[in-house]
Design a protein with these regions (language model features):
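A short, charged
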Residues: 48-56, 60, 128-142
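Surface-exposed interaction/gating patches
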Residues: 79-93, 98-101
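Negatively charged, low-complexity tracts enriched in Asp/Glu with abundant Ser/Thr
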Residues: 35-87, 107, 111-117
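Intrinsically disordered, low-complexity regulatory segments enriched in Ser/Thr/Pro
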Residues: 1-37, 93-132, 136, 140
């Protein structure tokens, strides 16, 4: 399972992440849009997205592959423009734990592959602790 939390210019975007029949993940509606200063709403949006799981969707063909759903909420037309001023936290869940992959900070291109901070949450309250950790990191990034 997988989820994304994006921060761009003071706005937090938390899309639903669907899994295609082919096995890859794409961001889909609904997308929560929250001000980065509102810790409680960030936490609620993350919990809601995780609660929705990863719905299964048909694999789009190359011709019908949609633009990233978060672009319209960020008021940009291209992924390249979006990622210039955005950070992405990725949450992965396996059988026993959640992993939080935090973005590289203070680097020219934080989206490039490279070392990231990975935290593991395997307690009973993992979703609560994970959501609070992301909200605090988001607020510390602004």
């Amino acid at each position: 399972m997988l989820w994304h939390v994006y921060l761009r210019k003071g706005t937090v975007l938390v899309p639903t992440v669907a899994k295609t029949d082919a096995g890859f993940f794409i961001d889909v509606e609904p997308v929560a849009v929250v001000e980065s200063t509102n810790r409680q709403e960030i936490i609620s949006a993350i919990k809601a997205a995780i609660g929705r799981g990863n719905p299964i969707v048909a694999t789009p063909t190359r011709a019908e592959f949609p633009k990233p759903v978060v672009l319209k909420y960020a008021n940009v037309k291209s992924w390249a423009t979006f990622e210039k001023n955005a950070f992405c936290w990725t949450v992965k869940k396996n059988a026993s734990a959640f992993e939080l992959h935090s973005p590289r900070m203070n680097v020219p291109k934080p989206w490039e592959e490279g070392p990231v901070k990975i935290e593991t949450f395997d307690t009973e309250a993992a979703i609560d602790i994970l959501s609070c950790s992301i909200a605090d990191q988001v607020r510390g990034t602004v």
